[in-house]
């Protein structure tokens, strides 16, 4: 028996040398988008009886995919540790690791309707996890020498911006609204500081084709920000919410114009980078609709977001059936 275990470990070691782990960390964008869309549908429960069923189905699928990916990442930590280490120290790819605590919090948000205790545990794990990761990894960049202008990619929004906004929303769900404001402030200031740096980089140099799908992350900050804000202020659509929504739509128009350039080399799973922004657009649209504010725009935003994420799902299924989903 030990002989077979030794052979298996040697085989795994050989595989590590010859091929990458089949699941990139960026693929956590799939349960991210599905979970956020589930929450958007949940907020329509009092308007459409079927909305709860749609939300539950999306939530169950998102949670199942998240569990699968977490197990695969645990396997990666065990047998592909050098690849994990390289990703952590990469000036670009390290940001995608933040998707793990972000999705953990969103799955906690979904589970809250069924099991508040487990949900709260997941939300706190995600909140503490993202804060520790940002503290350890992002602070290293302040030491200099490890970050260059070309390292400025949209994925850099994830650790300090998206993660803090998600913490704000999740903590508000648990009733910690004041604490949520702290994370909201952290995310908003981080966004304001990083946004001009990224836009300046995009103006003076082009993203490589393999990184262009990450442009979808640019859609997220404004819509995730307004969703977090509406969570902690009890859903009141005030002037700030309208301002944030307006900026989100401006980014949407820019990205629609750039989309042919983004997919110049073909469709790929990386396009799920758009999903968090799209789902947060739908989520905030429900609050605008409930508040009788820009109801026509909110209906369009909700329908558009669902159609776009539906197309991402169809693309993913196609890639799976063609054997093009996992890295080889």
Curated annotation (Swiss-Prot):
Q: Name one GO cellular component term.
A: plasma membrane
Q: Which GO terms describe its biological process?
A: response to antibiotic; response to tellurium ion
Which Pfam families did the record assign? SLAC1
Entry's localization field = Cell inner membrane
**Periplasmic topological segments:** 43-49, 113-115, 175-176, 233-238, 290-294
TM regions (residue ranges): 22-42, 50-73, 94-112, 116-141, 154-174, 177-204, 209-232, 239-262, 269-289, 295-321
Q: What is its main location?
A: membrane
At which residues is there a site annotated Important for gating?
Answer: 276
Keywords (alphabetical) are: Antibiotic resistance, Cell inner membrane, Cell membrane, Ion channel, Ion transport, Membrane, Tellurium resistance, Transmembrane, Transmembrane helix, Transport
InterPro entries for this protein:
SLAC1/Mae1/Ssu1/TehA, TehA, TehA/Mae1, Tellurite_res_ion_channel, Voltage-dep_anion_channel_sf
GO molecular function: any one? monoatomic cation efflux transmembrane transporter activity
Q: Which residues lie on this side of the membrane: Cytoplasmic?
A: 1-21, 74-93, 142-153, 205-208, 263-268, 322-328
Effect in UniProt of substituting residue 29 to D: Blocks channel. Abolishes ion flux
Q: Name the reported effect of residue 276 to L/V.
A: No ion flux while channel is in closed conformation
- Give the way it sits in the membrane: Multi-pass membrane protein
Q: Give the family per the record.
A: Belongs to the tellurite-resistance/dicarboxylate transporter (TDT) family.
Q: What the protein does?
A: Ion channel involved in potassium tellurite resistance.
Quaternary organization: Homotrimer. Each subunit forms a channel.
Q: What is this protein called?
A: Tellurite resistance protein TehA homolog
Q: Which gene encodes it?
A: tehA
